[in-house]
């Protein structure tokens, strides 16, 4: 029989991907020896009450993972106040689409999802405040074929570097994954061409009945002019407003892109630099509001109702607040997938970083983790049913076949999601985005 201590798994990252994998391994009827490494502090349960981004979990992806972890009843109790209604307008305020959803993609806040998953994992399985530095092949003969994980405790000012040997290291460590970096020739994230900023405010029906009606009860989006406004209902009557700006909203960048003759089907133009846009935008809410609402490169030509919403959002920020503009990154569409690396598996953004313009990121991440856990379970069944005297060795020998099977499924799904996301980004920030959206909605 394969003992728990015979085969060790390291999961690097405690986001939705890493925690889904840990939750599914915990729920397994088999005994898996795994440790989750996370550089941040353990989130306090009270953070569930802090407004944050909402995630719509797709039935065949994120919801399938929730059910696979045995958490569906608990999930139903913590769904977001944001409904599945989606309203899409153009910059004149004309409604292009208004749908109510069919219950197939329920919303949950990111904080609530993290807490839901955390509550299903034994506390001792997660090492908080632990920064993974790198991984290297283990160099002792008895650990041949295994990986050495080097890490340090970030909660202590001066702490020595520690090392541990693992049979399998799972990279769930996001966009700038150190585990992905250990794979030869694996690409680094590239700038998608889009930057964003986020604000939170309260829009009550009593105070702003017209705004409340325009926004609706779920997600509200305005597309056009190389920009996208997205507003989502959050907990406690809060509204989360995101402004997505493509670098080409700047006239100088548009001219440069036109001259480049870049084929956008292959991905973002390498000439795009997020600093061009970020350095043109102040962080002070009052100054930023003045620039965005009056300059032709930004929202000056948008309808008065939409500009009023933006004005309310900016004026709702505290006086000394800073509104930070951040770039959005993605992994290149080609080459993909990457070469298999012995003893390593990637899930979520570490494997397939994409922008949010198809809503697939967290769904693909959770589906990755579920599929990987199920491959490990199948491998465990084969191993424990073997009559061999060294089941751990058999498990290790057959591991690469299980990882390859996982990658065939995960990378096919991820490639489709990455390509769809890129097409949606191009559509959202095209010169005639509103017309194209209307055609898509009518088809």
UniProtKB/Swiss-Prot annotation:
The keyword Glycoprotein does not apply. This is Monooxygenase asqM. It comes from the Eukaryota. InterPro entries: FAD-bd, FAD/NAD-bd_sf. One of its GO terms (biological process) is biosynthetic process. Monooxygenase; part of the gene cluster that mediates the biosynthesis of the aspoquinolone mycotoxins. The role of asqM within the aspoquinolone pathway has still to be determined. The first step of the pathway is catalyzed by the nonribosomal peptide synthetase asqK that condenses anthranilic acid and O-methyl-L-tyrosine to produce 4'-methoxycyclopeptin. 4'-methoxycyclopeptin is then converted to 4'-methoxydehydrocyclopeptin by the ketoglutarate-dependent dioxygenase asqJ. AsqJ also converts its first product 4'-methoxydehydrocyclopeptin to 4'-methoxycyclopenin. GO terms for molecular function: FAD binding; monooxygenase activity. Its EC number is 1.-.-.-. The keyword Transferase does not apply. Pfam families: FAD_binding_3, NAD_binding_8. Pathway: Secondary metabolite biosynthesis; Alkaloid biosynthesis; Mycotoxin biosynthesis. The lineage of its organism: Eukaryota, Fungi, Dikarya, Ascomycota, Pezizomycotina.
